[in-house]
Regions:
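Binding/recognition "hotspot" determinant
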Residues: 1-394
Length: 394
């Protein structure tokens, strides 16, 4: 298939029993969403999932290659060549809203449909950047990713949001209300898996909330920096209950709020003979390099800071009475109590180095669980450090 401008496979299937070659200015393989409902009651779901299948596949775009929530499967070799390669997700959504500021229900849920790229040997080449988000690159043999610019292997995010408020009015100015908000996110990792994995960048390699697994050997090379870092999932809740008495002169309200950050680590695993060519930084994640591995740049590991908070506030107002030697007395007052907690937790990295591992520029290992065999340090020092968890209570 050859086109002067673009070849767009939108929600369709392209299949060849033998070889498939597509050449164009731009190439896209896009799944589609079905949208039902209207602005305040809307559901979008994956409907037509695009796919490309053949024994051998060659996709050659002079400009951009885009694969969104779609699959490409080669029985043998798969090659993707473009100026920019973007492999990402499509997002399903359930949105509903009903009511006003006093009585309402809101639902807003989002989930990702990943792209899946499969083959015996997979080769991805970009003159600029390779961006992989919330998707899977799985090779039975070799997975080779090369960019003159950045290689970004990052996660997508699923989320759930539910908010509900109910208010009731009674006689004589009395009322009750209750409001609840819950929100949480879930990391959707990208996965690059192969018997052998080779990643080469003319600039930086970024692995964020994702996994790179070489079941035999692997090579990661960057002229800039290599970063393997965790992302954060969020868990948030808010609950407020309010009661007002006669004429609004008496009342009580209780407000509780919770915010949690949860570590969503990356994993970089090479069974044996790993070559890390460039400075590498690992944050709140796992780095496992087997026997006979080499790190030619400086190795830095550290924790990922997780912040959590909790607050509980109670307010009261009303009348009080007492009987004493001076007679009967009536008073009116307000009271307030607060509890606030803030936590900083360091999610440690895990570093595992096998036997006969060489560090050619030393290492700084902080807040990290370190397991190792025989390690040789040719240049630089190995420094160890710690982080301190903290808690503030008011």
């Amino acid at each position: 298939i050859t086109a002067k401008n673009s070849v767009d496979n939108i929600g369709a299937n392209i299949k060849a029993n033998e070889d498939l070659i597509i050449s164009a200015k731009d190439i896209s393989n896009l799944s589609t969403l079905r949208i039902n409902g209207h602005d305040l009651d809307r559901i979008s779901t994956g409907e037509n999932l695009a796919s490309i299948e053949a024994k051998n596949i060659s996709l050659d775009a002079k400009n951009d290659f885009q694969n969104s929530g779609a699959s490409i499967k080669a029985d043998e070799d798969l090659t993707i060549t473009a100026k920019n390669v973007n492999i990402d997700t499509i997002e399903e959504n359930r949105y509903f809203h009903s009511g006003d500021s006093k009585n309402y229900l809101t639902i807003d849920n989002k989930s990702n449909i990943s792209s899946n790229i499969e083959g015996n040997n997979i080769n991805i080449n970009a003159k600029n950047d390779v961006d992989i988000k919330g998707s899977n690159i799985v090779a039975k043999g070799e997975a080779n990713i090369k960019a003159d610019g950045d290689v970004n292997i990052v996660s997508a995010t699923d989320s759930e949001y539910l908010a509900h408020k109910e208010s009731r009015k009674k006689k004589f100015g009395r009322s009750r209300s209750e409001e609840t908000i819950n929100y949480r996110t879930s990391n959707v990792a990208s996965n690059v898996i192969g018997d052998k994995v080779n990643i080469t960048s003319g600039k930086d390699v970024n692995i964020l909330g994702s996994n790179v697994v070489a079941q035999d050997s692997g090579n990661i090379s960057a002229k800039g920096n290599i970063t393997e870092a965790a992302t954060k999932d969020i868990n948030y809740s808010y609950h407020q209950k309010t009661k007002k008495g006669f004429g609004g002169l008496t009342g009580k309200s209780v407000t509780e709020e919770l915010h949690q950050e949860i570590n969503a680590e990356s994993n970089l695993y090479v069974k044996n003979k790993a070559v890390i060519d460039g400075d590498i930084k690992v944050l709140g994640s796992n780095l496992v390099l087997g026997d006979n591995s080499i790190i030619n740049g400086k190795l830095t590991t550290d924790s990922n800071e997780l912040h959590s908070s909790y607050s509980l506030e109670e307010k009261k107002k009303g009348f009080s009475s007492s009987i004493g030697s001076g007679g009967f007395s009536v008073g009116y007052g307000k009271s307030q109590s607060k509890l606030k907690e803030k936590d900083l937790t360091n999610a440690k990295s895990n570093l595992v180095l096998g036997d006969n591992v060489t560090l050619n520029k030393g290492a700084e290992i902080t807040a990290t669980n370190f397991t190792h065999g025989k390690v040789t340090v040719n240049n630089g020092d190995v420094k160890f450090g710690a982080r301190k968890d903290t808690r503030d209570v008011e």
